[in-house]
Regions:
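Bacterial N-terminal signal peptides that target proteins for export
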Residues: 1-8
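Bacterial N-terminal signal peptides
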Residues: 8-16
Length: 165
């Protein structure tokens, strides 16, 4: 009998330890904002782990990574039809790194680079038909330059107050 108990402990203990190392995954509805920091409802402790949101039809809407109550890591969203909507990296609650977004038909909608929550570098956007709409450069959140196209892919001149003569 002692052999059976020892065997049960040796098999069960590693499974329990693995389970303890996993981060919590909660529904976004279980989080609430406390002075700029997200916590589990009824708690003042900043949340660390993952959360998700669903559409009314049960389709996944988003998945968020949290660290100390702020978005941190990859955030992913989906359109209601199941097509991926966007991927953005966050650091300390601010976009940081590359963001890619897609129209609900799967065509790329935008691609941008962020640093400390501000657009920084190249940003490109596309029409739903796949034609390029805008390609521009940003520095510290300010547009430096941009070019525009119409839905047929022809260049257009739009007033751009960032240009100086």
């Amino acid at each position: 009998m002692k052999t059976f108990h020892l065997f049960a402990v040796l098999v069960t203990l590693p499974l329990l330890l693995v389970g303890c190392g996993e981060k919590a995954i909660v529904n976004d509805e279980e989080l609430e904002l406390h002075e700029g920091i997200y916590c589990l409802v009824g708690s003042d402790t900043p949340y660390t782990g993952k959360s998700f949101a669903l559409y009314e039809n049960g389709q996944k809407r988003s998945e968020t990574n949290w660290k100390d109550g702020k978005m941190d890591g990859l955030w992913i969203s989906w359109h209601e039809n199941g097509q991926k909507g966007a991927e953005t990296n966050f650091k300390d609650g601010k976009p940081d790194g590359q963001t890619i977004a897609w129209h609900d038909n799967g065509q790329k909608q935008s691609e941008a680079n962020w640093k400390d929550g501000k657009l920084n570098g190249l940003k490109t956007t596309w029409y739903k038909n796949g034609q390029k709409f805008m390609k521009g450069n940003w520095k510290d959140g300010n547009k430096v330059s941009a070019k525009y196209w119409n839905p047929k892919g022809e260049p257009v001149n739009l007033f751009d107050e960032t240009k100086t003569e």
